[in-house]
C-alpha cells in the first residue's frame, strides 16, 4: 500500500514539472508501462513516444483539412464564373432569336401554303387568305388576357391586361385553296364568350384576312389537359382542334386589322420574348468577384480573423 502511494506522488510530480517529462532520461527508477503508461529504458523514465507522434499527426491532419477546404471553397467562384459565361452565351442566342422573330413578323404577307408540312418552317410568318367563317363551330381557348401590341412591346411578354376572357377560334374556308383552316379571331371578355352576346361582330360573307402562322403549343406545367368532348381548350392543339371541327390542322392568328365592332379583338400574337439574361450575368459575375476576394484574403494573404 505504501509503495502504491509513493508511486502516485512520483507521477504527480512528473506531471507538475514539465522539465521532467521531456524526451531525455530522468533520475528515477523504472516504472512499469502497465501502471503509468510510460516507456522504460535503462531504468530511466522517458516521455511517452505517442505524445510527440500525436502532435505531428495533428499538424499533418490540420494541413490536410486546410488544403481540402481551400480547393473546395475555390469551387464556388469558379462555378459562378462558369454560370455567368453561360448566361452571356444565352443572351447572344436570345437577341438573335428576337431579331429573327421581329424580321418574320414584319415581313410582307405571303399566300398561305396549302401543305401543312410546308408551314412548319413558317411559324410567325404573316400569310393572307380569302374565304368565309363558319361561326357554328367556334372554339374557345381560355382563360386568356388581351394583348395590347404597343404595351406588349414595352413590357416584353408580361400580361398586358388583367381582364380574363377567351380567344375565339373559328373555322375559315379558304375559297382560293379549297381548304378549311382555324383562325384565332382574337380576344373577347368572359361576358362576351357566348356568341349570342356579340352577333354584331359575327362577320358574314367572304373576307380577306392577314394572319400569323402558329403551330401546336406545348402544354405548360400546371395547365390542365384539353377536354374536346366538353369543348374545354386550355392550349393550342392543332390536331385535336382540327379533328373536333373537321378542318385541316392549319392555324393562324388574325391581325389587329381584322377587328370588327362588337367582335373579337385581333392581333393577339405575342411576338416578344423576355430577355433578363443581363441581370443573371451581373448576379453571377458579382458573386464570382465577391467570393474570389474572400478566398484570396483567406488563403493567399492569410488575413487574421478571416
From Swiss-Prot:
Sequence intervals crossing the membrane: 68-86, 280-300
InterPro entries according to UniProt: Surf1/Shy1, Surf1/Surf4
GO cellular component: mitochondrial inner membrane
Organism superkingdom: Eukaryota
GO biological process, alphabetically ordered: mitochondrial cytochrome c oxidase assembly
Annotated Pfam families: SURF1
Cell compartments where the protein resides: Mitochondrion inner membrane
CDD domains linked to this entry: SURF1
Keywords: Membrane, Mitochondrion, Mitochondrion inner membrane, Transmembrane, Transmembrane helix
GO terms assigned for molecular function: cytochrome-c oxidase activity
Membrane topology: Multi-pass membrane protein
Known function: Component of the MITRAC (mitochondrial translation regulation assembly intermediate of cytochrome c oxidase complex) complex, that regulates cytochrome c oxidase assembly.
PANTHER family assigned to the protein according to its UniProt record, in alphabetical order: SURFEIT LOCUS PROTEIN, SURFEIT LOCUS PROTEIN 1
Family according to the record: Belongs to the SURF1 family.
Subunit structure of this chain's protein: Component of the MITRAC (mitochondrial translation regulation assembly intermediate of cytochrome c oxidase complex) complex, the core components of this complex being COA3/MITRAC12 and COX14. Interacts with COA3.
Protein name stated in the entry: Surfeit locus protein 1
Organism: Rattus norvegicus
